[in-house]
A protein has these predicted regions:
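Non-catalytic pre-domain segments flanking phosphatase-related domains
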Residues: 1-7, 165, 169-176
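Conserved Lys-Pro-Asp/Glu-containing loop-to-beta segment of HAD-superfamily phosphomonoesterases
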Residues: 100-127
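Active-site neighborhood of HAD-like aspartate-dependent phosphohydrolases
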Residues: 1-47
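Acidic, Mg2+-coordinating phosphoryl-transfer loop and its flanking beta/alpha structural elements
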Residues: 122-158
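Structural recognition of alpha->loop->beta junctions
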Residues: 69-88, 152-173
Length: 176
């Protein structure tokens, strides 16, 4: 049976930059490349889910976000396809239903890839990421690399697994 991991982007895989629209500002967080490689080598399907409401506010375009996503993939510099799918939630008012903490994208992954919730992992740096995973009844991991750290620590009870970086999360997931 397939196993899947959904990653948040900003603050989880790349350094948080407010209103990121310039691919030159995309910077991988430590160990991201090694962690992605390890999960792919273990057969995990990987997905990216990012809230980008600034698109609907007119601050930047969907193309800007796609260019930043492409830069992330370029920086990973891996010899295989990294993400099975990428979801960009661009609506501030969630017209499409994809804005976190909505479980819509995760439910589509479960259905499309014949996954059970127990084989889906959601990893992020914010309360919205954790709530999204909880709404999916899947495994949830918080990483202390984003800007929501203080809020996140106040809500540590939202997840059983809360770690300093992605390496600690990878070790916890792969050891099972």
């Amino acid at each position: 049976m397939s196993k899947c991991i959904v990653f948040d982007r900003d603050g989880t895989l790349i350094k948080y930059v407010p209103y990121l629209k310039d691919p030159k500002q995309v910077e991988l967080l430590p160990f991201v490349k090694e962690v992605i490689r390890a999960f792919k080598n273990k057969g995990y399907k990987l997905f990216l889910h990012t809230n980008q409401s600034s698109i609907s506010k007119g601050l930047f375009s969907i193309e800007d976000v796609k260019l930043c996503n492409n830069r992330l993939i370029e920086l990973l510099d891996l010899e295989f396809e990294i993400f099975n799918e990428i979801c960009i939630a661009e609506d501030y008012d969630d017209i499409t239903g994809y804005r976190k903490p909505s479980p819509k994208f995760g439910k589509e992954i479960l259905q499309k890839h014949s996954i059970i919730p127990e084989n889906l992992v959601y990893i992020g740096d914010s309360i919205l990421d954790i709530q999204t995973g909880l709404n999916l009844n899947c495994k949830v991991f918080g990483v202390k690399t984003g800007i929501d750290l203080r809020k996140f620590e106040n809500h540590f009870f939202y997840t059983k697994y809360f770690y300093n970086d992605l390496v600690q999360i990878k070790n916890r997931i792969i050891q099972k």
